[in-house]
Amino acid sequence: MSSQVNTTRDSRRKILQGIVVSDKMQKTIVVQVERKSKHRLYKKLVITHKKYHAHDEKEECKIGDFVEIMETRPLSATKRWRLNKIIQKAK
C-alpha cells in the first residue's frame, strides 16, 4: 500500500493522508503521516514521519486504516485535526 502524502488546501484548510497507529483514546486517533523530500546536499530521498492527533466523532477508525484528516479549530491541547474520510480499511 502506498502511503503517499497529498497536501492540498481546500478552503484554506490543510488535508493530509496517513495511517492510523493508535485508537486507544475516546474519540481520538493518532495518524502517522509520511513525507518524502530530497536532501539538499546529497540528493538522497529522505522519508520523515510525523504523528497527528485527530478527532474521530463516531469512533469508526481502527489501527491500520488509511485515512484523510483535515485541519480544524483546536479541540484540545493536542488535537487540531479531524477525520475527513476513511480511504481504505485495514485487513
Swiss-Prot record:
Biological process, per Gene Ontology: translation
Entries under Pfam families matching the protein: Ribosomal_S17
GO cellular component, one term: cytosolic small ribosomal subunit
Domain of life: Bacteria
UniProt cross-references to PROSITE patterns, sorted A to Z: RIBOSOMAL_S17
Example GO molecular function: rRNA binding
Alphabetized UniProt keyword annotations: Ribonucleoprotein, Ribosomal protein, RNA-binding, rRNA-binding
NCBIfam families membership: PRK05610.1, uS17_bact
HAMAP family to which the protein is assigned, alphabetical: Ribosomal_uS17_B
Complex and partners: Part of the 30S ribosomal subunit.
Protein family per UniProt: Belongs to the universal ribosomal protein uS17 family.
Function: One of the primary rRNA binding proteins, it binds specifically to the 5'-end of 16S ribosomal RNA.
Protein name: Small ribosomal subunit protein uS17
Source organism of the structure: Malacoplasma penetrans (strain HF-2) (Mycoplasma penetrans)
